[in-house]
Amino acid sequence: MAAVTSAAVSIPSFTGLKAASASNAKVSASAKVSASPLPRLSIKASLKEVGAAVVATAASAMIASNAMAVDVLLGADDGSLAFVPSEFSVPAGEKIVFKNNAGFPHNVLFDEDAVPSGVDVSKISMSEEDLLNAKGETFEVALSDKGEYTFYCSPHQGAGMVGKVIVN
């Protein structure tokens, strides 16, 4: 263990200090506060940016999905044999998705006597032997020639399962 002698350590003495009385004490202080300008948040600008992001996201989702297509159900929710909707309009080239809504076998054929002249119905129709047997199965077509097209389901045409599309 190391020994420390009194000569090596000096302890200050505070005996000569006097306390100032409260009446004689003067305290003076000044402070200068300067604030640097901070950028203000703009809620309006933030909402514009968020809105633009939402619109851009929605637009890309619509382009990537069937949002630009018309969905036509084969069979109504109540079980009736019908196209839903049975009549509709689409712009030329827009995709039409026919979707089996029931467990019944359906198909989609375009009537060769009820399409614009020059349209080859074999290129836009399903084969008469092909059927959408299960619920959720689909057939897609895009019609490019303007005019009225009549279509039907061959197994249920006699029951009135007929529809019409107008291509603008």
UniProtKB/Swiss-Prot annotation:
UniProt: Cu cation binding residues: 106, 153, 156, 161
Record keyword Plastid present: yes
Cofactor: Cu(2+)
Feature: transit peptide: 1-69
Domain of life: Eukaryota
Function text: Participates in electron transfer between P700 and the cytochrome b6-f complex in photosystem I.
Membership in a protein family: Belongs to the plastocyanin family.
Name under which the protein is recorded: Plastocyanin B, chloroplastic
Source organism of the structure: Populus nigra (Lombardy poplar)
Name of the coding gene: PETE
